[in-house]
From Swiss-Prot:
Pfam families xrefs: Inositol_P
Gene3D superfamilies, A to Z: 3.40.190.80, Fructose-1,6-Bisphosphatase, subunit A, domain 1
Binding annotation for Mg(2+) 2: 157, 160, 283
Entry keywords, A to Z: Hydrolase, Magnesium, Membrane, Metal-binding, Transmembrane, Transmembrane helix
Cofactor(s) it depends on: Mg(2+)
One example GO MF annotation: metal ion binding
Membrane-spanning parts: 11-31
Protein name according to UniProt: Inositol monophosphatase 3
Record's subcellular location: Membrane
Family named by the database record: Belongs to the inositol monophosphatase superfamily.
Catalytic activity: a myo-inositol phosphate + H2O = myo-inositol + phosphate
Organism name: Danio rerio
Length: 341
């Protein structure tokens, strides 16, 4: 007698396959929803996870910045005028990068405050962080640093150096994320979209970059904003002498990295970073955290620490240094009236 068997018709096979796909979909959807629910219920944040997330956000935003520049679809517009009267530009690169960065962070940790230079009216993206922590972070940063969400403020700059971005001066362009705890900069990430170079620092834990071996404060190289280079020249020369080399550059992130020993061969280097006019906190917080993680300083021109809670602006100018007597530098600076505006 021949063995009994089960034969499925083509219709039966199709129904069976559809049922299988349905089961897989519901299982996957359940994993995603449970992951989102986990983060929404959590009222504390692990800072090592937030560092890894910040790097991912900066890189994802950077991809948008690079793609739009390469496609030449900038859609350049103006927000208005800066306090100095210059046109404050924004592009599709700024907006798309903002969406990627802002919603990745907010979807992962909805209870933390996120301040961004840009504001998009479009619907948020359903982006979920993979929770993958890079090996270099696992090696250098210990876990378990849980901080109440209400103590945290995240500052993001989706595209630093927009003016230079529109001029195709791409070495100055960065995306940045900074994490402040009770107003103090703790984590900083600066990513260069056009070279793929990323720098991070975690105060008290370490960084993936190092300072240089020495810095010259007798006849220093001073990096300043290229849009204010003429205005700040006399200020710098009064402090450090007429032969002081002044390096005009775009982007606050780029200028902060100039004080370090980066492996990016397109990065200029300087001994001191000075800014004399009003500047937004999303421009400087990441650089401040990275410098502090390596023993450096970023203060107002009067030597005051910058509070990264509250209002978005810093009116006191900026002095940044590494491995030198920062207080002695402050004493050499002349009075600058514009920083009171």
């Amino acid at each position: 007698m021949a063995p009994m068997g089960i034969r499925l018709s083509p219709l039966g096979i199709a129904v069976f396959c559809l049922l299988g796909v349905g089961v897989i979909y519901h299982l996957y959807a359940g994993v995603l929803s449970s992951r989102l629910a986990f983060f929404r219920q959590k009222r504390t944040v692990d800072l090592r996870e937030l560092l890894a997330l910040s790097i991912d956000a900066a890189v994802q935003g950077g991809r948008e910045v690079k793609r739009i520049r390469e496609d030449n679809t900038l859609e350049e517009k103006s927000k208005g005028k800066t306090k100095e009267g210059a046109s404050e530009k924004y592009t599709l690169g700024d907006l798309n990068s903002h969406r990627k960065m802002y919603y990745l962070i907010k979807n992962t940790f909805p209870n933390i405050q996120v301040n961004s230079e840009e504001h998009a009216n479009a619907e948020g993206e359903a982006t979920v962080w993979t929770r993958m922590i890079p090996e270099d972070i696992l090696a250098k940063v210990s876990g378990g640093k849980e901080i109440p969400a209400e103590k945290i403020t995240v500052w993001i700059d989706p595209l630093d150096a927009t003016q230079e971005y529109t001029e195709n001066l791409l070495k100055y362009v960065t995306t940045m994320v900074c994490v402040a705890v009770d107003g103090e900069p703790v984590i900083g990430v600066i990513h260069k979209p056009f070279t793929g170079y990323t720098v991070w620092g975690f105060v008290g834990e370490g960084s993936n970059v190092a300072p240089r071996d020495s810095y010259n404060t007798n006849s220093p190289k001073v990096i300043v904003s290229r849009s204010h280079a003429g205005k700040v020249k006399s200020f710098v020369q009064t402090a450090f002498g007429n032969n002081t080399e002044i390096i005009p550059a775009g982007g606050a992130g780029y200028k902060a990295l100039a004080l370090l020993n980066p492996t990016d061969d397109k990065q200029e280097t300087a001994d001191i970073y000075i800014h004399v006019t009003y500047i937004k906190k999303w421009d400087i917080c990441a650089g401040d955290a990275i410098l502090k993680s390596l023993g450096g300083q970023m203060t107002t021109l009067k030597g005051e620490q910058i509070d990264y809670s509250g209002l978005e602006g810093n009116k006191g100018g900026l002095l940044a240094s590494m491995k030198v007597d920062h207080k002695a530098l402050v004493k050499r600076l002349p009075l600058w009236e514009d920083n009171k505006q």
